[in-house]
Every structure is written in structure tokens, then in C-alpha cells.
Amino acid sequence: MLFDREVAKLEITDELITQTTYWKQIIDEYTKDNSNGAEIINKARIMLVYYRPAEDNRVILESELQSKPTATYADVLENVNISNLDSNMTLCQVESVEKVYDNGSQKWHYIATLKAIHKYILQDIYGDEETISSSSIDIEKLPLKYIEGMVATRFGSENNGDEMALADPSLDFNGFEEVINTLIYDRNWNDAMLLYRYIRGYSAKEIRNWTKGTSEMMPDFINDDESRLETLVRALTGFFLLPPYELFTIYSMPSALHQFEALKSNFVLMVRLIKKFINELNLGNTDKLLNIYNALTDNELFKNSMEQIKENSELEVQFNYEVERIYKWHKEYLQLGYITEDDLKLIISLIEQNQNNLSKRSSKKDTSAMKDKIDKELNKKIQSNLDKQQKEFLLREKMKAIKEQLNEADDEDGDDEYSKIVNDPVLKQMYPEWIIKAIKTERDKLKNMMSSSPDANITQTYISNLKKLPWRKVEVENLDINRAREILDKNHYGLKEVKERVIEYLSLIINHRNINKESSEKDLIKIDDHNQIDLQLFKENTKNKAQKQFNNVPILTLVGPPGTGKTSLARSIAEALDKSYVKLSLGGLHDESEIRGHRKTYVGAMPGKIIKGLQSAGVSNPLILLDEIDKMSSDIKGDPTSAMLEVLDPEQNTKFQDNYIEHEYDLSKVLFIATANYYENIPAPLLDRVEIIELNSYTINEKIKIAKEHLVEVVLAQAGLKPDQFIIDDKALEFIIKHYTAEAGVRSLKRNLDKIARKIVTKIVSGEKIDKFVIDQNNIPELLGTPKISESEKEMQPQIGSVNGLAFTSIGGTTLQIEVSWFKSKQPGIRLTGQLKEVMQESAKIALSYVRANAEKFGIKNVDFDTTEIHVHVPEGAVPKDGPSAGVTFTTALISALAKIPVSQEVAMTGEITLRGKVLEIGGLKEKSFAAFKKGIKTVFIPKNNEKNLSDIPEEVKEAINFIPVSHYEQIWEHLFKGKKSDESETESKKKKQSK
């Protein structure tokens, strides 16, 4: 049995739903899409009825406490007698309905959560009149299925039972009484009854006589022997002027509660009948009648009743039927002559007369009286507000005086955790003294504010943010360098140099901790196994050596193309040190307040990202990742980069100022790590405060190993597949990498593997049995679609005026074909196409100037540069290109075209050229070498100053490519052109030999 406020679960079975549509309505209401956040306000209610076990219940019960598993709701109704009903009942509210999948039955079930509201006592039952009213049948022995309704009273009240049953808000006892009183006061009720009686078949004469007789015989409204409900029902039946047969129907009902509900239904029926009558009326002017209808419907009682009717389709059908039935009778009354059109005209004239009289009385009211009424209402509202404020102020002053007399501290804070910490002499040290004082000051201000004041909400939010900050709370770090190395190796394949740099960086941090361990241990207070209180924080001691040494550790910045593992590497560092990990996305940030926070006086003000990150971590020494630090920008709202200078400067971040907090915060224990795609985009002052670690592109073999050792395992776990259901070899992975990805990292590769896994899962869910699934080059297009990247055809024969260059882009390295042709023209000079930007255009012009100056040496003959137009084109014109590293490639292509000497397509080059032919250093050599390796290039010319970068290139690339360092372009010319004749010379010599 459920008692008040107890909660229970109820399974809504298919049988329950078929018994009544009520449960179907509840399921639809509670499980509909509430994505807009709307809550169910009018929650459904049910009455739980209990029965006691007896001998004749063995069909449904195993014992007194256990039901048979096979027993159904229908079995209960068929086999439990009315005599077994318990007198106790519980009114419950349906709090929620949850949809749950049952693996056993392979079906969805609905589970309702019920909350008990009140206990009720069973008073009476009613049902089939022929069965229950029969004197020959013992009602007690009838099964429950004959019951159609029950009457119950709320438990625990000495008042009349019917009145307590009205505790159910849906009865709207007071609302009905108020509506009727208002309608009577405005004379609308009398007009409505005139019209209603006519519709029901009464002539104008009968209505006037009956109204007069009823008013004379109306009994006293109050009767001491009746309950309030009985008195209201008796009065309402008089106001409704019901005919005898309807009065008999109402008074024969088992209780006043049923009579009250019948009168409510009668009211709704009357209003809907009047509406239909007005719509069907052929008279020209129906404004007066519409006024009556509007008065009857302009109240919450009628609106709520109509909503309940619309929700219950059976009730809606019943009301429509009753309206049509009574209106049909009305037409028959007209045909039989019981009522006439003259009766209607007389009734309408009476209604108009009543409304005109009411209007005249209203217009004759004294203007000063109306003014006094308005003033009285305004004064009443003002006085009410003043009384409320004075009452609140008086209560606060009394509370303050009582606490002063009892000498009690104000511990009522609503934050039990904060109170517990502050009252503990040890844990209290987690908060600096000035912060505790500041919180107390703000709380004192809050006490003197009105709860409705906007400042009260601002102050409460400010206090809450101060409490949430960890202040001196730090977490215990793991200082095991071997563990750090194991975690990096486990989570990341390759990146040997990057890992070594990270290990060196961590070693420096760990060494500082170990050196100062003994001196700092005395300032550490243990909270638990994972957290401590560090008294060195927020300490007015500028000579804190440990802190200075720690601050001298540079901020690590990981720079590399997207998908190369920068974010995951930072997460691994946090895991290695057992630090909390907080990621702050700075991409697109252009407002300084996002870093420093807003002043608390602003509407909706909150702390900046740094303080929010510390609140999220819960400690003052987390690892904070500053993601995409190169993508911040400045505008009229300030420069966030300048704010980051204070955060990352070891000399300033011990006293970081957030505009919202208004207190200095020590960031010296925070381990900051930043990520960026291009260090060129990081402002110079910020770059000066960080140490750069570059993460370069992966080779195809590295991507294959990463996929096999890391990505495939993750894909299987996310898709719920077995290893045999996702078998992929190296060739298939290489095919995906070459034809479906164009990236430096492996992010796109992971997406494509996820897509394949989803295709396999779809096949399995669709009913296809797959124990083993092999992914190869043949079925990859079926799984991923048409290849997005097609390999360009490799030119096997040497070409004139076409040379392979190497470029470095955001997705890694790529080869760049440079083409040159020349012809006589009236517009001599150089024409550049292929969407070349300014620096690359200058590089091409420098190359042409160098070639013209050394044309004789390079074997360029019969070319008049003053009448020759030279066209330089870089294919893939839709892609912008820039940079000086194609200088030697431009030079080689120009010499090849002008001297008509072909260049091998297995040769590529990179380097900036000067007017004197010097070859200068370039960047991104590793990525460019990957591109050459991928295309099958055998020889690559590189600047002499880049020879040091060859150690960064994997051995497999160096074994396949011959790198030739050069300091001057003549060295390239000697390799490619020296001693070679042009195609024209060779053709002429062949002709001469043939002629001989």
C-alpha cells in the first residue's frame, strides 16, 4: 500500500491499454517529443484500489504476498469479489513514463512512475443498475468487473466526506461557484437561461411564469444540516431552472460529488447548445446573443472543461451527440407548435432590454466614483507591495537580533560543503583569509537586499563562483618518468623525436618537484590520497625559490598540421602526471573578456575561460590545453592575445587578474600546453614565451601502422563489431589512404574506417549473417563510394619545359608541376597563371632575370627576349599558391623550355633562388620529401643549408630518394643540362646521318 509521497513503478501492459484509452493518452502525453524543454504541468492522476487475499483468490495468487506470473488484469476483475476490496485507496500522480526495451520478450515496455498524493476511504460503489440494484443478488459476492465507479473520501478529516473529495484540483469547486456568481452579477446568466429554456422547448410565457415561481420558492442558500457542496448543488439546480425529469436524474445520483460533476457537464452542454443555436439562426443581427456566448466562455472553468473534452475522444463524441439530439428536439418543438418564432423575438427583445438597461446604469455612474474606485485599486496594490517589503525587512531584522542575542554565527549558507570546510580548522586553510572575509562581506550585503532585487541574484552568483574556485587545493602528481614514457609509447606510434622532447620537458618538471620536495612538504596538508592543500599558493612571498624555478619551465607549444596528434599528446601528458585535464578552445576568439572575464556589474557577467577551467578541474594545478592558440584575433572588443601574455608569463601569472573575480589568482602551479597549426601565426611576444615542438606529417607506412595498432581497435569498440567482422590488410589501408584521404594526420582515415564499420553494422542489423568480413581493394569503392583522389599519371619520358617542384601545404607536402612555353609576341615578357600569389610571382621573375643574364652559358640560342613572351603555368589553378621555394624549379623549367632540353620526370627540386644563382634554405623539407616519395621521385635537389634536416627524414624515404644538397644553381645545371644537346640539334644530326 502506498502512503503520502511514496513512489512506485507500474508497468503499463498491453492489457491495461486495451481495457481503457486513458493509459494510451497518458503514454502519448508523457512520451511525446519535448525537445523544446516544455514540462508536463497537468499531470495525470489515478486511484489505486487494493484487495485482500482470500481462499477464492487462488486463481491469481500463489500466496498472500505473491501473485501468479500468469495472472492477468482480466483475471483479477473476473475472480476477485467486491467483498475482498480494501477500504483504503490511494490517489496517485503519474510523474513520468519511461520506455524500456525487454531483451526477454524482445518488445518495448512502458513503466510509469507513480507518486502517492493522498489516502482515501472507500464509501460507495456504483455500476450496472440491473445487476447491482437487484435484490436477489448479494452485491458483496459480485466480481470487480461489475464496478463502474466509486465514491471515496479523503482520509484524516473530520469534515463532510464529499467536501474532502474536492481536494482533487480537477473538480474546481471554487472556480464553478465564482463563474456562476460573476454571470449572475452581470445579468448574463439570466439572459442565457432565457435563451436556453427556449431551445429546450419552453414558450416565452412559460419561461416568465416559471422563472417567477422558482424565484419565489427558492429556499435559503445556507443550511446548517448540509455540507458546503450539498448547498452549492441545491442552489445551482435552482439557478439552472432544470425541468423535473432532469432534477430527478441529478438528485437520484449516489452523492453530491456526482451531482456536482453532472452540473458541470450541464453547464458545458448548455454553452455548446447556445453556440449551435446562434450559428443556425437566420436572424440578421445576432450581436446581442454572441455577447451572451462570449460571457459564458470567457472563464477558466469552461476553457479547462473544453481541454479535458478534447483530450477524451469518447467524451467529445458524447457531447456532440447530446447537442445534436437536443437541437433536433428543438426543431420538432417548432413543428409541433410548442414554441413559435414570436416567442424567440420576444425573448431576444427581453435580452436586448436587459443589456441596454445594464449599459444605461453603467453610463450614469458618477465619474468621481469611478475615479475613487481606480484610486482604491491602485492604493491597494501599492499597499500590498509595501506591506510585503516591510514584512520581509522586519523578519530579517528580527532574525539578526535573535542571532546576536544567542551569540550564534550565521552558518546558514545553503552550501553545506563550504560550511564544512570553513568550520574545519585544517581544511579552512584551503581558502586564503581574504577570500573568506570577502565571501562573508558579500553574504552580509546579500542579507540586507530584497530577494526580488536584481543585485541579490548578482551577489549570490558572485559568492557561488568564489566558493567553486579550488584556491589552495592541488592534486598529487605522479613523478615517475618511466611511466610517462610507457604512456606516450602506448598512446602514440612513431613521433620518436617529439616523444623525446616531451620526455625532456617532463623530466625538467619532475626534477624541479624532486629538488624542492623536502622544503615544500611542510607546506602541504593532506586532504585525501589524491588531493592536498598547498600553502605556498596565494602567499605574499616574492622570494619563493621553488615557485620561481618552476615558472622558469617554458610553456610547451605543439605545432603541426591537423590530425597529427597534438591534442591527444597533451592528454597523454596529463595522464602520465595524473593531472586533471582541461581543454580551452581558443579558435576564433576575438574578445579579451573571454580570457579575463566581464565585470560582475554587467548583465550575465561570468568569469573568463581560465577561471572557468580551474572551477571545472577542481584543483589549482591541472593541465590546461590552450587549443588553436594561433587562431585568436583582435577587434574593437580587445586583443585576447595580449591577455594570454599575462597567463603564460612566469613573472606575471602568480597574480593573474580576472575582471569578474576581482581577486588575484595564482596560476604558477598550472601546467599550460598550447597547440597551433602554424607558428608563423602566433604573435611574436607570445611566441617568445613558449617552446615549439613540431609534429610533422606521417608517412603512408606510419599511417598504416597507426591504423592497425590504434584506429581499428577504436573503430571496432565504437561499432560493436568483432575482429573477424572487420578484417583489413595493409594494401587495403594504403588504398584508402591514397584514394580517400589527403591529410598530414590520420583523422580522415579514422572517419573512413568508421564509415566502413557502419556499413557492416547496417548489413548485420538488416538480418544478414556476417561471421567474417574482409575489406580489400575490390569492395572498398562499394563501402566508401567512388575514390575522391585519383593518382595522376606518371610521366615516364623526360619533358621539355615541365619540371617537378615540391610544396608544403596545410595538409602536408605535395608535388608541384611547373610548365613553361615561349613564343613570339608583340607583348614580350613573362605571363604567370595558376593563381600565384605575390611572393611566388616575384620568385618566377627572379628566375627569368637569372636565366636571361646567363643565357649564353646555359646554351640558350636563337631566343630574342625583347620579342618573346614566356608563359609560366602552375597546374591546379583553383588552388592559391605562394612562397619562394619554387625558385630553382622555375629556373630549371625556363632553361629546359628555352634551350629545348628535356628534364627527367624522376627528378624534383626545392629552394629559393637569388639573382646571382644562390640557392637559399626552405622549410617543410620532411613533408616535401614524403610527397616526392609518394610520387616515385628518385632524385631531389635541396639547398645545402637544409642538409641538416635530412636526419629528420625516415630511413625508408632516404633509401628510396637520392638527396643532392646544392648551394648554387650551377650545380643543378651541371647535373641536368651540361653536355646535353637540345632536341632540335639531335633531330638535325639524325637527319644528316640518314641523308649520308
UniProtKB/Swiss-Prot annotation:
It catalyses: Hydrolysis of proteins in presence of ATP. Its main location: cytoplasm. It is found in: Cytoplasm. Keywords: ATP-binding, Cytoplasm, Hydrolase, Nucleotide-binding, Protease, Serine protease, Stress response. One of its GO terms (biological process) is proteolysis. The active site is at S885, K928. Induction: By heat shock. This is Lon protease. It comes from Mycoplasmopsis agalactiae (strain NCTC 10123 / CIP 59.7 / PG2). The lineage of its organism: Bacteria, Bacillati, Mycoplasmatota, Mycoplasmoidales, Metamycoplasmataceae. The gene is lon.
